[in-house]
Amino acid sequence: HYSNKIKQVQLTGVPIQFPINFGEASLSGFDSNLSFSSKAELFNFSSSYAYYLFSDPMAFQLQPDKMVRNKITFKIRWFQLNLIHRSESDRQFTSINSTGTFLHNRLDAINTYDANLSLKLKFRDYKGAISFSGKNLNNISQELNGISLYDQRYNLNFGLSWK
């Protein structure tokens, strides 16, 4: 229970937020986690589920009431592959426009898939890593006040370290 819940209000059109006192608000719910690994740890599965009840969803901005995250990991020698599924219910937040009017905004539920492939090598005192990842592979994008959210992205990373 919160007696003086502070929430951030986004000023429309600029990257500025300011706090306001929302007053009384409460949040309850539960989180659950499940994990399974093969004996040799070549395969791992983990799943998380969260469910929340809000006295007022606008008091807890951008907080979904339901979240599911599943992750499958395969490890074979130097390679590791992660496959990730994330699902979140709709989210709400408050913004204010240039005339001072409060706007109640809603982001639709999301359901995304990500993948990451990494290679780790060791040679004497050197360690190297290469990873390639893709986010939001199903390309479900959202737009908020002209700003694109959850875009499909690809990353290639290299790392080298020496003892």
Question: Where are the language model's segments positioned?
Answer:
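Gram-negative outer-membrane beta-barrel transporters
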Residues: 1-94, 138
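Conserved long hydrophobic alpha-helices within structured protein cores
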Residues: 27, 80-82, 105-115
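Short glycine/proline-enriched turns and hinge-like loops at secondary-structure junctions
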Residues: 62-63, 99, 126
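Outer-membrane beta-barrel domain signature
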Residues: 19-23, 56-61, 102-106, 143-149
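Hydrophobic, lipid-facing positions within transmembrane beta-strands of outer-membrane proteins
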Residues: 28-32, 66-72, 111-117, 152-158
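Short, surface-exposed loop/helix-turn segments at secondary-structure junctions
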Residues: 95-103
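C-terminal beta-signal and adjacent terminal beta-strands/loops
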Residues: 2, 39, 89-96, 108, ...
